[in-house]
Each structure stands twice: as structure tokens, then as C-alpha cells.
Design a protein with these regions (language model features):
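Glycine-rich phosphate-binding loops of nucleotide-dependent enzymes
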Residues: 1-276
């Protein structure tokens, strides 16, 4: 079983209101999406592939621009701001994208240079300090048991699990207040997957708000505190992961609103009981 630590006092850190986003071809990527996430919480996101998960991540991090709506970070609206402008506001957000070696890391570079990619935006002068990046790379190798011939070996030569540890490790080390992860265990073996779940729970215990986009419903139900379901670029519900069932999530993934899904499945349970 995956651990789900219980956190006390939690405050809303990010509130999304009526977010509508268009794709470059003019079709709708997100339609009137609203939700909030608290500190020390894992909000799972479930949905059939292509329901708006990728666009949600990219809009929250400033890589895509919303057509309407607001993303309130501690009540400050960050819609329309670039990732660099978001950093300048003192907002600490980390993103672990689905495309690890295309968007997350540079495949031909080693760990050290990939650490530098994150830190150079925060550098104060014209010179890049390699020493802290090398120390960080070595620290991650030890802490996360990353298997690599060396910290300068191109990351494309590593296994998928090790690549993901490098990426998530780097993003966590920047001490984010919000951590957005898209399919972080896709293609990983069970041991690597549990390492990732532990890392996410560690962040939760530090008070980080974690958005976890996943495809395995069992994992989503065990790891998340609340679960948001997307269907055809709309939110069909945000529910308590401890009490909702897999069947209810399945109904919501095919378009049933949360209240409707709860009613329908409780009706099925009643008739099943009567048949006994």
C-alpha cells in the first residue's frame, strides 16, 4: 500500500477560477475549469488521455496562456505571465512534465548541466557556477540511489526510472511551494515507482501543494487526498479520494457529474443488497 500521511492545518495556496484555454488550432483545451489546492495536499487528476491534463499543467506554469479565467497564487492572478515573470514574483513552482527528455531534461547533457538549467534563471551574475550544480548532482545520486556511470554521462543513457529520479530530484531541490507532476511513474518498475511516491509524500509533509496527474486509478485513490476528474476538457468533479470508489471515478471519467456518479453507484449497491 502507498502511504497517505494526514496533514493538519492547511491553507489554500492556488485557486483556479473558470479557466478556459484554447489550443493553437482554435479547439478548446480546457473549458471553464475551477478548483483549488491546499498546502500539504496531494490533488490527484484523473481522466482519459487527452482530457486536458497536459494543457492544465502548461497553463498553470505559464507555458500556455488562458483565454479567460484566473489562476490565483496566494490571491495574485498569474494568468498571462511567463515562467520567468512567475519566478520574479517570488512564486516557487516546479513542473515535472510528461516528456522527460524533451521538455524536462536535455538528453545529451549530463546531470551537472541539467542541474544548471534550473539554477541559471536564479543566478545573479553573468557567470554560471558549476560547483553547486556538481554537488547537487552528487547529492541526488546518493539520496535517490541513481544508477549512472557518472554525473557528466548524458542522461539519455540512463534507464527511465533513473531519468525520472534526476528530473524530480532537481525540481524538489528548488524547494517549491507548488509541485506539478505529469505521469511521473509512467514506464517505471515498481521499486522506482514507490521511490517517486515517497518523494511526493515527503514534499507533502513539508507543506508543498502537489498536483499529481496519473493514469492508474488504484494509485490515484491511495496517494491523493482529493481527486479531480477531467472529461472532454471539463471538470466533472473534485472528490475525497478516501471515500470515492473506482466505479464512481470511472463514471466521472466518461462524463457523469460527481453527484450523478455517487447516486448511480449507490443505487447499484442497494439493488445488489436487495438481490442477496
Amino acid at each position: 500500500n502507498i502511504e497517505r500521511p494526514e496533514m493538519e492545518k492547511r491553507d489554500t495556496i492556488l485557486k483556479v477560477v473558470d479557466l478556459t484555454v484554447d489550443k493553437s488550432d482554435g479547439s478548446i483545451a480546457l473549458d471553464d475549469v475551477s478548483f483549488e489546492i491546499k498546502t500539504g495536499e496531494i490533488l490527484g487528476v484523473a481522466g482519459v488521455a487527452g482530457s486536458g491534463q497536459k494543457e492544465l499543467c502548461e497553463t498553470l506554469t505559464g507555458l500556455m496562456t488562458a483565454k479567460k479565467g484566473a489562476i490565483l497564487y496566494h490571491k495574485e492572478n498569474i494568468v498571462g505571465k511567463t515562467p520567468a515573470e512567475i519566478i520574479k514574483l517570488g512564486i516557487s513552482m516546479s513542473f515535472v512534465p510528461e516528456d522527460r527528455l524533451g521538455m524536462g531534461l536535455v538528453a545529451s547533457m549530463g546531470m551537472v548541466d541539467n542541474m544548471l538549467l534550473k539554477s541559471y534563471t536564479e543566478g545573479k551574475g553573468p557567470f554560471v557556477e558549476r560547483k553547486p550544480a556538481r554537488e547537487l548532482a552528487q547529492k541526488l545520486v546518493e539520496k535517490l540511489a541513481i544508477v549512472t556511470p557518472g554525473v557528466d554521462t548524458p542522461v539519455r543513457l540512463m534507464s527511465g526510472g533513473n531519468v525520472q529520479k534526476v528530473l524530480l530530484g532537481r525540481e524538489i531541490e528548488s524547494s517549491p511551494q507548488v509541485l506539478i507532476t505529469a505521469y511521473p511513474v509512467r514506464g517505471l518498475d515498481i521499486n522506482s515507482s514507490y521511490t517517486i511516491y515517497d518523494l511526493l509524500n515527503e514534499q507533502k509533509k513539508k507543506g508543498v501543494a502537489v498536483i499529481y496527474i496519473g493514469e492508474d486509478l488504484d494509485v490515484l485513490l491511495e496517494l491523493s487526498d482529493r481527486l479531480m476528474v477531467l472529461c472532454h476538457v471539463k471538470v466533472t468533479g473534485v472528490v475525497d479520494a478516501k471515500t470515492v470508489t473506482k466505479e464512481q471515478i470511472g463514471l466521472m471519467m466518461t462524463g457523469a457529474e460527481a453527484a450523478e456518479a455517487m447516486k448511480e453507484t449507490s443505487g447499484q449497491e442497494l439493488s445488489a443488497d436487495q438481490d442477496k
